[in-house]
Amino acid sequence: MAAKFRQLNEALDWVFEAPKKEQVSRLKEVASSDQTVVPIVRMGVGAEKPDWGLPEGMPEVAKIQDDIPDGMGETTLKLEWRRIIQFTNPKANLKNLPPWKQEQNWLSIMEGLHHKEAKLITAVKDRQLLKLYPKLEAILKDLGIEDYEKPKGKRKSKSNK
């Protein structure tokens, strides 16, 4: 039985500290009690490509407190999921708002989340989850995700001597 996690980043850390053989079962265990895991993983690796209507990266004006211990954020991804998923739904009332107001709503969600969860959902929005959790790529096929965005590796520059 999986331990209960308040934050999704804690659950994912628990999943990927296990040996590779156990990671799939641990992720499924976490997903059985948290409805946000499956869509977050699918969107984060690029298997689903919704239009978030938001600029890339963390908002520059975000006042994220990074000195708060795990489990002590004002809110969590689970609690905010209903609001977050509206950014991906083209028929949501949120999409009727001007872009600056949508960004303001996103900013208020980011500032309420724990800093690690804010980084996690930003990586999901930008389809960069594999950069945050590189071990996830090894188990995607076991999860049934075959079409995803592979992370672009850093190219080493050749020096001419």
Predicted regions and their residues:
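N-terminal nucleic-acid-engaging modules of covalent nucleotidyltransferase systems
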Residues: 1-161
